[in-house]
């Protein structure tokens, strides 16, 4: 009996020690926030995403495993701006966990047509300057809920913010190669408003947001007319949706199909955009290449 008690005590102490030494755990709603948060957290915390690489995030359907994952977190980070329309109902099943919106302080652009007209465009991370606000909000959340690692988070956030700031000039130089008369970015989803605003591009798209009907005859006809009227040479699609509507527009308008852009999700680690910085670089390079520059 005495030996059994000693064993149980040792196991309990061991479990307590493991819990005491366990890293702070962050769960995010999608992979872009996961990568930004991991850069801020460094080795002081683990960061996991509910949605997997390549997943469609707007109308994601959470699973019981996702609830378990969120319940195991010390902190949950989500985008807000009506991106994750599933999140608030999902969060009702998660008890006593802090959830922080990482877009606080961003000036949102409005969706200008469709059922979501005048609602905020949620894809704010497509502006590097907005990414700095994401970094600051994530850092503040980590410092608040894991203060013992505050110095680590402060340093990592400053270092990562500097990397993001250094992206702007090369991205701007690449996009400046597109002639003024051709500076139209035509895509499937209207997810590039922030990128277009930052880098002086006009925007056209088949549907405003992925919750909409996608690739209806009316949408396709509207964009075909836009492309023809403005002599737009290239049309793009995005990685998390079908390319067929954009390809149809290209075929019927005489434009070129320029390939896949990345916005709503990172790729797997062995894919083309395993990080947020890769997402911006590859997307801009694909745009410029599509224009033949």
UniProtKB/Swiss-Prot annotation:
Residues 1-22 form the signal peptide. CDD domains: PsaA. One of its GO terms (molecular function) is metal ion binding. InterPro entries: AdhesinB (IPR006129), Bact_metal-bind_prot9 (IPR050492), Lipoprotein_PsaA-like (IPR006128), ZnuA-like (IPR006127). GO terms for cellular component: cell outer membrane; cell surface; periplasmic space. Disruption phenotype: Mutant displays a reduced binding to laminin, vitronectin, and epithelial cells, and is more sensitive to killing by human serum compared with the wild type. It comes from the Bacteria. Residues 23-48 are annotated as: Interaction with host components. It comes from Haemophilus influenzae (strain NTHi 3655). Pfam families: ZnuA. Part of an ATP-binding cassette (ABC) transport system involved in metal import. Binds a metal with high affinity and specificity and delivers it to the membrane permease for translocation into the cytoplasm. Acts as an adhesin that promotes binding of H.influenzae to host laminin and vitronectin. In addition, interaction with serum vitronectin plays an important role in bacterial serum resistance. A divalent metal cation binds at residues 58, 123, 189, 264. Its main location: membrane. Belongs to the bacterial solute-binding protein 9 family. One of its GO terms (biological process) is cell adhesion. This is Putative metal ABC transporter substrate-binding protein Hpf. Interacts with host laminin and vitronectin. Can interact with both immobilized and soluble vitronectin. The keyword NADP does not apply. It is found in: Cell outer membrane; Cell surface; Periplasm.
């Amino acid at each position: 009996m005495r030996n059994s008690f000693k064993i149980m005590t040792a196991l309990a102490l061991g479990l307590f020690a493991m819990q005491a030494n366990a890293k702070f755990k962050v769960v995010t709603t999608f992979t872009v926030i996961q990568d930004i948060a991991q850069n801020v957290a460094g080795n002081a915390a683990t960061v996991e995403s509910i949605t997997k690489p390549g997943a469609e995030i707007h109308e994601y359907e959470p699973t019981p495993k996702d609830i378990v994952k969120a319940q195991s977190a010390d902190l949950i980070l989500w985008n807000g701006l009506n991106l994750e329309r599933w999140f608030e109902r999902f969060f009702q099943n998660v008890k006593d966990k802090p959830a922080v919106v990482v877009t606080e302080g961003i000036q949102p652009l409005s969706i200008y047509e469709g059922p979501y007209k005048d609602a905020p465009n949620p894809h704010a991370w497509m502006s590097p300057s907005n990414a700095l606000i994401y970094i600051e909000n994530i850092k503040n959340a980590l410092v608040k809920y894991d203060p013992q690692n505050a110095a680590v988070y402060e340093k990592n956030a400053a270092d990562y913010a500097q990397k993001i700031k250094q992206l702007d000039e090369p991205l701007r130089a690449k996009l400046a190669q597109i002639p003024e008369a051709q500076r139209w970015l035509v895509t499937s989803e209207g997810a590039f408003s922030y990128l277009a605003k930052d880098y002086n591009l006009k925007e056209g798209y088949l549907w405003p947001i992925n919750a909409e009907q996608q690739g209806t005859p009316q949408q396709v006809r509207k964009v075909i007319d836009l492309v023809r009227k403005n002599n737009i040479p290239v049309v793009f699609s995005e990685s998390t949706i079908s390319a067929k509507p954009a390809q149809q527009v290209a075929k019927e308008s005489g434009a070129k199909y320029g390939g896949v852009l990345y916005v709503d999700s990172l790729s797997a680690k062995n894919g083309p955009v395993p990080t947020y910085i890769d997402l911006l670089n590859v997307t801009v390079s694909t745009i410029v290449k599509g224009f033949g520059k």
